């Protein structure tokens, strides 16, 4: 975007785009406006990540889309000349291109967390927090895209405003004391959970457990508190879609020690 809109430069003429998220579609639009013609789009999953009908946009622009595919190798000397790609049917194909545009599988910009004493959640790539936004050191709060990759500006704004209110409440000594809390374990195709720990306290904090799956899945989401079922629902989910579980609906006993969040896919 900086090359095209700020410097008026074309970094390539025939790029291969990896990813089919919303930002990937934005890249197609930016290329189109600049007279750049992408040669193809690759997606490792069996369908586009962006919601339908937005996922139709590349095809309407004449850009082929390859699903269940992956980038194997980039060829070229001095600059990109081609890419070797494994397609969905197992064939390896050489696609001529002069650039590779990586537009998916983002991670949070959590460098400061990695360099600090704060606990990092390997699943989300962000700091571990409780339902009040407090990190492992409760003097620090976190919100927005630091907590997980790819969240909308609107959601991040509302979450940041909510966490700011909780921070103010903490300064007034209105939040419960920080504690190790209830550990949350996820299984099945669940990719991440935010927050990563809970306090069994009625003080309002973030309203939901925020979950995401790593692949398209249908089945039942089941939550157990110390082995006892407390919440269950039939769901169909896609990658990078926000999946919300209302914390108030869990009604966790105050002595709860462990929360299991399991996605039982159809057939299991």
Where are the regions that the model predicts?
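Phosphate-coordination loops involved in phosphoryl transfer and adenosine-cofactor binding
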Residues: 11-14, 68, 77, 137
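Beta-strand-enriched, solvent-exposed domains that form extended recognition/catalytic surfaces
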Residues: 180-268
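FAD-site-proximal beta/loop scaffold in flavoenzymes
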Residues: 1-4, 99-150
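A Rossmann-like FAD-binding core segment of flavoenzymes
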Residues: 25, 32-114, 119, 205-236
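Short hydrophobic segments within beta-strands
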Residues: 18, 41-42, 143
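A short, basic/flexible loop-to-alpha-helix module at the beginning of a structural domain
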Residues: 2-12
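A conserved FAD-binding loop/helix module that cradles the flavin
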Residues: 143-195, 263, 267-268
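Glycine-rich Rossmann-fold phosphate-binding loop(s) that bind the pyrophosphate
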Residues: 19-23
């Amino acid at each position: 975007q900086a090359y095209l809109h700020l410097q008026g430069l074309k970094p390539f003429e025939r790029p291969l785009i990896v990813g089919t998220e919303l930002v990937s579609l934005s890249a197609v639009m930016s290329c189109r406006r600049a007279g750049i013609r992408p040669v193809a789009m690759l997606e490792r999953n069996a369908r586009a990540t962006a919601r339908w009908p937005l996922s139709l946009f590349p095809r309407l622009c004449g850009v082929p889309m390859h699903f269940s595919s992956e980038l194997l190798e980039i060829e070229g000397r001095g600059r990109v000349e081609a890419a070797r790609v494994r397609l969905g049917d197992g064939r390896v194909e050489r696609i001529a291109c002069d650039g590779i545009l990586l537009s998916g599988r983002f991670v949070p910009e959590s460098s400061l967390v990695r360099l600090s004493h704060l606990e990092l959640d390997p699943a989300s790539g962000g700091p571990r927090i409780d339902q009040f936004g407090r990190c492992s050191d409760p003097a620090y709060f976190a919100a927005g895209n630091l907590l997980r990759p790819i969240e909308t500006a609107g959601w991040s704004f509302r979450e940041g405003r909510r966490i700011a209110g909780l921070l103010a409440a903490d300064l007034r000594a209105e939040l419960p004391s920080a504690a190790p809390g209830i550990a949350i374990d996820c299984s099945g195709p669940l990719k991440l959970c935010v927050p990563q720990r809970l306090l069994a306290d009625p003080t309002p904090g973030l309203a939901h457990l925020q979950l995401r799956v790593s692949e398209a899945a249908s089945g039942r989401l089941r939550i157990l508190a110390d082995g006892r079922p407390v919440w269950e629902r039939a769901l169909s989910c896609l990658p990078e879609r926000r999946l919300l579980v209302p914390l108030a609906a869990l009604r966790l006993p105050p002595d709860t020690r462990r929360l299991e969040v399991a996605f039982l896919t159809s057939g299991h």
